[in-house]
Amino acid sequence: MGDQFDSLMERIRVRQAEMSGEGEVAKENGPVTSKITSVKQEVASPTKVFGSSSKCNDGPSTPVHFHPQEPKETTPNMKENAENSLNSFKDATVNESSSKKTSRFSMLAQEIDEYEYDYQSQYNKPKEAYMKGRSPRMSIGETRPAVLCTPAGAQAMKSPNVAVSSKSAPEIALGMSDFEARRIKFAQPIVNVNYLPNESSIFSGGSGSSVNDQSTVLGGSAEMMNVTTSSLSCGELSMNQHITHENTIINAQSCDNREAILRERQQVSNEEYGPHTFMRKKVPKEASSATSSSSSTTTLTTISGASGSTTSGISNAPQDSASTKTTTNTFTSSYLLTKTSNNNINALVSSSPKPFSKDIGRSMFSPVHFTPKSTSSPKTLSESIFSPSKSAAVEGSIATTRRLQFEEKLKKSSSANVTAPPAPTSAPVPTPRHVAPLAPTVAQQSHLTPNHRHAAQQKKHLFPVVGIVATAPIPVQTQWRGQSNTPVVQGARADEKTAGNEPPVGAGVGKLKNLKSRWEFSSATGTPIHPDATEDSLIATAIKMKESAIPKQLGHRSERKGPSASSLYSQGARSNTASPASKSTRYEQEEEDDVFEAPEFNDGGDVISEDGILQEEEEDTSKFIDNAFGFMEGSGAGTPSPYREPPLQRLEKNRPPAEVIEEETENEDESEPYEPEEEEDDDATTQFPVPERSRKSSSQLAYSVSFYRKIQRDRNEESSTVLAGPVISQISPSAPPMSSSLTSQQKLRQLTTGPANGARIVESAKDAHDRIKRAIQVEEQLVAQSKRAMILARDKPSFRGSREEFEAQWAMLRHVEKHRALLTEYDRLKRDGPRIIDGPRGTITVSQLSVNMARDYVSANIASSKKSDEVFYFAAILRYGEQVDVSKMVTSDGGLNRRGVLEFPVPLMLTGIPPDFRATVEIYGQRSMRESTSHEDKYKLKNSTFKAKTRNTFLGGGSTSSANQSLFVDPAASSSSTSSTTSNFNLLGTFSFDINCPGKHLYNMSHTVYPLEGITQMKVRKQAIDGADITYHGFLSMYQRTGEGLGSWTRYWCALENGEMKFWKQPEDEGTKGYTALMDLSTCCRSEGASVVEDICPFPNSFHIDVWAPKMDTSDPRGIERLRVMLAADTAQDLQTWLSLINSTSKQLCTWRNPIVNQ
């Protein structure tokens, strides 16, 4: 350090002498050597030195002439070089003139502009500097003066001059190092600059530095810029490398002791501190560049200005690195600078390394890299090293093992240039029958090597697209849309493509987008996979989706902690997200049985399927992916192939046929005279019970424990409830305890035919008796009240023939008719028992009831000049069974004002009636004279005078009391004593209607009486208050379209309840999760509901249901369109069961619906 300060002071003295003209005086008075010697003996303070210029570390752009102090220990070469430098210095000093004072200032100003001082304050550090902790110098409490008291933040340590060691320190002759240097990464990469070759040479070799400590000149940041400290190759002339102490020790040891060395070096303090970074602006590279510096090492060269040749400063003695143990400081040398040209200076500066990139820093970041040889620039990428546990987890995954096996097979087949036949396995994966076999070409197989990451452009060779046979186009649009009371299915929209619009492409056959679509419709997670994802990420995501989609088995413990590669075939075939067969505890012993039939192999090794299609396992990449990911046969997620029979069904075929007779017990009430008759099968020849074990094994589908518990819970609820007749409960076509009884033909006949056995009794006979008795008592009281009001109105002359008297007669008519209907129903109940309702009950509402009046009566009133003195009162009655509803009373004046149409504005209603009802509408009326007494006279109000008025008799004779008599009453009956206690309303016409009537229709009345005409019009609104009484549970496959317009069959758990078909992914989801799809059977286009598909759908056991749905067109908000829903059962027997139940339910629901006509 002292020698450097002396050199700097001498340089400053020379500059001051040149500016003040002292140079010429010194030349005249004495030799230059004595002046330089006297200048060397003067001591300058550090404050003055660094106060003069903050950039005294860097060399100027123009030659600077000064002579440093000669070292005490020099070599002969050094002495000779010193003499040459003194001679050149004398010549330059004589030629200098004081006239260049102004130009010298401009040169100094230019130097300041060309250099840049980047000072990073400790309070303005980036975020990354704090993520790894504070600076070591601040955190460990550094107190050494050499570190804390260094002027300008270790500025002298960054000087291009070489630090000279003490006298006692011996020189170290080091050989060429072949190890890779430690990587230093800056927190903030500095761009648009070229780093000086020696700007990072701030390491102190006395105590050494920790290898793991990554503090830098930016204040302790852990992520730094990579700077190599490796040595040059043998062919290089200059060795501008600074070998640090720790690298020397690491190079001396063997590779086995590297970790131990790193742990020992962590305890050593670090002196690589300094908050400043000096850099030079970019200088264009020149052809005269002689060296290429690449590391933060100390320059050790001697530049000759006369000849421009570069020679080595010291001699390098060869030394064995394996036995060398260096514990001393770095080597020493003298630095002699002479007059050189700008090109020679730029040759050292412009060869700095390029700025470090962020990507390289991430891949190369490591405390120490152990490589045999390293270049001068750390630009070589290296693969990231995983930990042993992570590597074992990645290499041991199921999908990775399957991928490696598949690539190995492809490699073998490509080397032989012949596709080898597949070896028979215990449980091979079946291929869909409508898909052609897939065979990759040799060119495609050449890209596939084991343990090779496929690039994006190579994935298209691994998954080629293969077309399949197109299905016939569907006549009607097949889609699902969501609105109220319309079918709803997730994953489909109205604007999606149909199967017949474009040429179909294989769904899920070697295309990532199709594979993504299968996951969207089939997996339980619903997480989409990007089609451009790499193969490894694709497999990893598929494994996660498979684990989350398949619940754990209840009561089952796996003996193996992880799946092996040998069990992938059977494991992939059993992984079914829709069917819970793998979750049943009853099938633990049958876990190894595959749900598909094992294909046969011929002598040539080809796989022979049931329909004769050849398959080759290693050639079908889509089949391999489906197997590895846990899919079942191509486009279906968990849909078993309908072309193969389940193993349980094959066992059932081998068993001798036996017919099971179900004994049904029914709770019958003693008061019921008629009992439902059970139909017996005349074709039954052998009748014997089947054991419980065989009954369980006859089921074709497995269920989970939760499903069995649900059935048991439903049984307990049914046993605790006392019913008056047979009630259809929740049934399942394949549940083992109930399979034989629910799929028998006898039960189907009970569900679909015969109102006696398949009917529903709403209430018992006792309850019906009690209810009707109470209703009769109420109506008797109301009849008595109406009778008293009518007698009171007739006894008083002021109310005789008034509106109040006719209101009392209307009330009397209403309650008398209700009482009469209740008595009739009570007699029927005692005779026939409670009413049996076949199907859901409903409600009808009759509105806009209008009756045409006789034309001659309307014409006479219109032609008359004054209003007629007679008036007619009318009332309408709607009746069915014990229910009677009476309309408000209207007069003939309202009909005359409406062109002869008599309207009843208040609607009539019947509630809770069976679908086989037949209701009757009756019109009652009577004739009377207009009221002549005013309101004040009737109620004897003040300021009113009672005036008796004579009236014309109604029948041409009699007193005024006869004015309230009806036109239609018999004179003999009117003269009897009971005429004052009965209503004078008489029947003028009647007509009937049933559930098949349209919404608004004209009816012809029978027994019509003047002044009514026999034409009536009304609007009937029918609405079911009960859903369908059929409840059924089972599996159904649903046809859906993907985003590309392709078809996909997905298996769902379906529950038919209350006329609605609800779909879930699994049986356990029912009652705990919301349904995936809903279809209301009341929207069926036909009352038959479902029909079998035989010509347009290749899926076996399929059927379709046509429904009405509102149009999505905003211009026609009330428009409807016809949609078709495609479904499929598992077996032919299940198909017949579903068709019978759906058609019966649809028929029951459509009976309460008005006929829909598509406009």
From Swiss-Prot:
<dbReference type="GO" id="GO:0051017">
    <property type="term" value="P:actin filament bundle assembly"/>
</dbReference>
<dbReference type="GO" id="GO:0000281">
    <property type="term" value="P:mitotic cytokinesis"/>
</dbReference>
<dbReference type="InterPro" id="IPR011993">
    <property type="entry name" value="PH-like_dom_sf"/>
</dbReference>
<dbReference type="GO" id="GO:0008104">
    <property type="term" value="P:protein localization"/>
</dbReference>
<dbReference type="GO" id="GO:0031106">
    <property type="term" value="P:septin ring organization"/>
</dbReference>
<dbReference type="GO" id="GO:0040011">
    <property type="term" value="P:locomotion"/>
</dbReference>
<dbReference type="GO" id="GO:0005737">
    <property type="term" value="C:cytoplasm"/>
</dbReference>
<feature type="compositionally biased region" description="Pro residues">
    <location>
        <begin position="421"/>
        <end position="430"/>
    </location>
</feature>
<feature type="region of interest" description="Disordered">
    <location>
        <begin position="409"/>
        <end position="430"/>
    </location>
</feature>
<protein>
    <recommendedName>
        <fullName>Anillin-like protein 1</fullName>
    </recommendedName>
</protein>
<keyword id="KW-0217">Developmental protein</keyword>
<dbReference type="GO" id="GO:0005938">
    <property type="term" value="C:cell cortex"/>
</dbReference>
<dbReference type="InterPro" id="IPR012966">
    <property type="entry name" value="AHD"/>
</dbReference>
<feature type="domain" description="PH">
    <location>
        <begin position="1029"/>
        <end position="1147"/>
    </location>
</feature>
<dbReference type="GO" id="GO:0040002">
    <property type="term" value="P:collagen and cuticulin-based cuticle development"/>
</dbReference>
<feature type="compositionally biased region" description="Polar residues">
    <location>
        <begin position="564"/>
        <end position="584"/>
    </location>
</feature>
<dbReference type="GO" id="GO:0005819">
    <property type="term" value="C:spindle"/>
</dbReference>
<dbReference type="GO" id="GO:0031267">
    <property type="term" value="F:small GTPase binding"/>
</dbReference>
<dbReference type="GO" id="GO:0009792">
    <property type="term" value="P:embryo development ending in birth or egg hatching"/>
</dbReference>
<keyword id="KW-0469">Meiosis</keyword>
<feature type="region of interest" description="Disordered">
    <location>
        <begin position="43"/>
        <end position="81"/>
    </location>
</feature>
<dbReference type="Pfam" id="PF00169">
    <property type="entry name" value="PH"/>
</dbReference>
<dbReference type="GO" id="GO:0030496">
    <property type="term" value="C:midbody"/>
</dbReference>
<keyword id="KW-0206">Cytoskeleton</keyword>
<dbReference type="GO" id="GO:0008017">
    <property type="term" value="F:microtubule binding"/>
</dbReference>
<dbReference type="GO" id="GO:0005874">
    <property type="term" value="C:microtubule"/>
</dbReference>
<comment type="function">
    <text>Required for contractile events in embryos that occur prior to mitosis, such as cortical ruffling and pseudocleavage. Promotes membrane ruffling by organizing cortical patches of septins and myosin II. Not generally required for cytokinesis in mitotic cells. Required for the asymmetric cleavage events that extrude the two polar bodies during oocyte meiosis. Not required for meiotic contractile ring assembly, initiation or closure but is required for the transformation of the contractile ring from a disk above the spindle to a tube around the spindle midzone.</text>
</comment>
<feature type="region of interest" description="Disordered">
    <location>
        <begin position="629"/>
        <end position="699"/>
    </location>
</feature>
<dbReference type="GO" id="GO:0051015">
    <property type="term" value="F:actin filament binding"/>
</dbReference>
<feature type="compositionally biased region" description="Low complexity">
    <location>
        <begin position="287"/>
        <end position="327"/>
    </location>
</feature>
<dbReference type="GO" id="GO:0031252">
    <property type="term" value="C:cell leading edge"/>
</dbReference>
<keyword id="KW-0131">Cell cycle</keyword>
<keyword id="KW-0963">Cytoplasm</keyword>
<keyword id="KW-0498">Mitosis</keyword>
<keyword id="KW-0132">Cell division</keyword>
<dbReference type="GO" id="GO:0030426">
    <property type="term" value="C:growth cone"/>
</dbReference>
<feature type="region of interest" description="Disordered">
    <location>
        <begin position="549"/>
        <end position="608"/>
    </location>
</feature>
<dbReference type="GO" id="GO:0005634">
    <property type="term" value="C:nucleus"/>
</dbReference>
<feature type="compositionally biased region" description="Polar residues">
    <location>
        <begin position="50"/>
        <end position="60"/>
    </location>
</feature>
<dbReference type="InterPro" id="IPR037840">
    <property type="entry name" value="PH_Anillin"/>
</dbReference>
<dbReference type="GO" id="GO:0000915">
    <property type="term" value="P:actomyosin contractile ring assembly"/>
</dbReference>
<dbReference type="Pfam" id="PF08174">
    <property type="entry name" value="Anillin"/>
</dbReference>
